[in-house]
A protein has these predicted regions:
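An amphipathic, basic-hydrophobic helix/alpha-beta surface used to engage anionic
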Residues: 1-75, 110-117, 123, 130-134, ...
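Hydrophobic alpha-helical scaffolding
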Residues: 34, 70, 89-93, 118-121, ...
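Well-ordered alpha-helical segments embedded in enzymatic catalytic cores
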Residues: 40, 98-102, 127
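Intrinsically disordered or highly flexible coil/loop and linker segments, enriched in small
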Residues: 50, 54, 90-93, 109-113, ...
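Von Willebrand factor
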Residues: 75-112
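Von Willebrand factor type A / integrin I
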Residues: 109, 123, 127-198
Length: 198
């Protein structure tokens, strides 16, 4: 009699990559996008460590601000939790080329990269797309952005004044451009999450 027991693979490197550029300073529901991202990242780190994986941390804006190589166990989570407090908002524009090239060079084995960032439009996102695509050739990448409930509400509400029409058109165009970027990333093998802040 033969019996197979299946176990979930363990000991995978997971890197939480936080963009701390000026777009992540913007508040959503009264809290900065970076703070929402850090809270979600810490929850993911806790669950990953409990599942037996290693967790690392990477913070960047115009340059790399923080790197912790992936480490497992409670010590790994404690270290990520402690050092995530060092992530701070920046007034500088994010340099995806420098940051993601640096991250790729630091990681020796294939892993999961959870990239928490934001972008404004397709033009600004072109350079980001190129670098995320290069990262996705070596690693599994999850691209995470936060939805802006006010923007979605503005695009969906029925306009009553001329100003409302203008705001709705701008909001709808912005949402459409975001959808175009997400679609490009998905075609390139990147998993995308555009999630509400809660």
């Amino acid at each position: 009699l033969l019996c197979k027991e299946f176990r979930t693979e363990r000991n995978h490197p997971i890197v939480l990559a936080f963009d701390s550029g000026y777009l992540m300073r913007e508040p959503v529901d009264g809290v900065a996008k970076l703070d929402h991202a850090i809270n979600a990242g810490l929850l993911l780190a806790f669950m990953s460590v409990k599942a037996g994986d290693q967790v690392g941390l990477f913070g960047f804006d115009s340059r790399v601000r923080l790197y912790l190589p992936p480490l497992g166990g409670n010590a790994g989570f404690s270290r990520v939790q402690r050092r995530s407090a060092d992530l701070d908002y920046s007034h500088e524009e994010t340099n995806f080329t420098l940051a993601l090239t640096d991250l790729t060079g630091r990681l020796n084995r294939r892993g999961l990269i959870v990239l928490m960032t934001d972008f404004v439009d397709t033009i600004a996102a072109e350079l980001m797309l190129e670098n995320v695509t290069r990262l996705a050739q070596k690693h599994l990448v999850i691209f995470v952005t936060l939805q802006d409930p006010h923007l979605q509400k503005t695009a969906a509400q029925r306009p009553e004044r001329l100003l409302d029409v203008t705001q709705a058109v701008v909001a709808e165009n912005f949402l459409r451009e975001r959808a175009v970027v997400f679609e490009k990333l998905k075609r390139l093998g990147v998993h995308c999450l555009d999630v509400p802040p809660e």
